[in-house]
C-alpha cells in the first residue's frame, strides 16, 4: 500500500491524468540525468529516485530502459522542432534555440551529445536529422531548385550542430551575444546568394 504522503501526491488528480503526469515526471528526470555534465549512470533506479516514483510506475509507461532513453531523446527533439517551427526570422530561431538548448544546457546535451554516448540513440539521432533539415527547407521555400534547397539546409544543419556542440562544450570562448550573432550571420550568408533578401527575414 502507498504511504499517506504518496497518496497525497495524487489527491485531486483524476485517475486518467495520473499516468500522463507520472510519465512526464519520469521524462523530466531522464532529461536531467541524460543531460548532466557529470554523466551519472542512467538506470531505472536512478530515474525513479530522481522522479520520486517507484519502479512500478516506471514500468507502467516504459517496457525497459532503452525505450525510456529513446522517449527522453524524442521529447527533447520535439521541443526543439516546436521551438524552431514558431520562429519567423533567422534571429528569432537562433535566439529561441539558444534559450531552449543553451540557457538550459541539459537539453542541449541530450540533443547534441547524448547520441555519441548512448548507443541506443545512434539510430534515433539519424532518424531525427532529416526532420530538422526538412524544417529548414520549408523556411527556404522560395529557392527554385529543390536539390539546391536541400543542400543548403543540410549544410546549415550540420554546421550549426557543430557550433552548438562546441559552444556547449565551452570550446569557443564566445559570449552569448557573439555566438547568436555568428549563427544568424551564418544563416544569412549561406542562403543570401540564392534567396531574395526579403525572404530571409
Please provide the spans of the model-predicted regions.
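Amphipathic alpha-helical segments used for helix-helix packing
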Residues: 100-126, 133, 137, 165
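C-terminal peripheral helix-coil segments that are non-catalytic and often amphipathic
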Residues: 1-7, 138, 169-201
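Secondary-structure edge/capping motif, primarily at the C-terminal ends of alpha-helices
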Residues: 83-87, 111-115, 140, 167-171
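Short, hydrophobic secondary-structure boundary micro-motifs
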Residues: 43, 109-112, 175-176, 199
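Basic/polar phosphate-binding segments, predominantly the helix-turn-helix DNA-binding elements
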Residues: 5-17, 47-68, 103, 108
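Amphipathic alpha-helical segments that line or abut small-molecule/effector binding pockets
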Residues: 28, 88-106, 150, 154, ...
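Amphipathic alpha-helical packing segments from all-alpha helical-bundle domains
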Residues: 119-161, 177, 185-188
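An amphipathic alpha-helix adjacent to DNA-recognition modules
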Residues: 20-31, 35, 40-44, 49-52, ...
Amino acid at each position: 500500500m502507498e504511504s499517506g504522503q504518496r497518496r497525497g501526491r495524487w489527491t485531486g488528480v483524476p485517475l486518467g491524468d495520473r499516468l500522463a503526469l507520472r510519465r512526464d515526471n519520469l521524462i523530466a528526470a531522464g532529461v536531467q540525468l541524460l543531460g548532466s555534465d557529470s554523466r551519472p549512470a542512467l538506470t531505472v533506479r536512478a530515474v525513479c529516485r530522481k522522479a520520486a516514483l517507484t519502479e512500478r510506475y516506471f514500468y507502467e509507461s516504459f517496457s525497459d530502459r532503452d525505450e525510456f532513453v529513446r522517449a527522453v531523446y524524442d521529447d527533447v527533439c520535439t521541443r526543439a522542432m516546436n521551438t524552431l517551427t514558431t520562429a519567423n526570422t533567422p534571429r528569432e530561431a537562433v535566439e529561441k534555440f539558444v534559450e531552449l538548448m543553451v540557457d538550459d544546457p541539459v537539453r542541449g546535451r541530450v540533443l547534441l551529445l547524448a547520441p555519441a554516448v548512448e548507443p541506443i540513440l545512434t539510430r534515433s539521432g539519424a532518424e531525427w536529422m532529416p526532420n530538422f533539415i526538412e524544417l529548414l527547407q520549408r523556411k527556404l521555400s522560395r529557392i527554385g531548385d529543390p536539390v539546391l534547397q536541400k543542400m543548403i539546409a543540410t549544410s546549415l544543419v550540420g554546421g550549426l550542430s557543430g557550433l552548438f556542440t562546441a559552444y556547449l562544450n565551452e570550446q569557443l570562448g564566445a559570449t552569448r551575444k557573439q555566438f547568436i550573432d555568428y549563427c544568424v550571420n551564418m544563416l544569412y550568408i549561406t542562403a543570401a546568394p540564392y534567396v531574395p533578401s526579403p525572404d530571409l527575414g
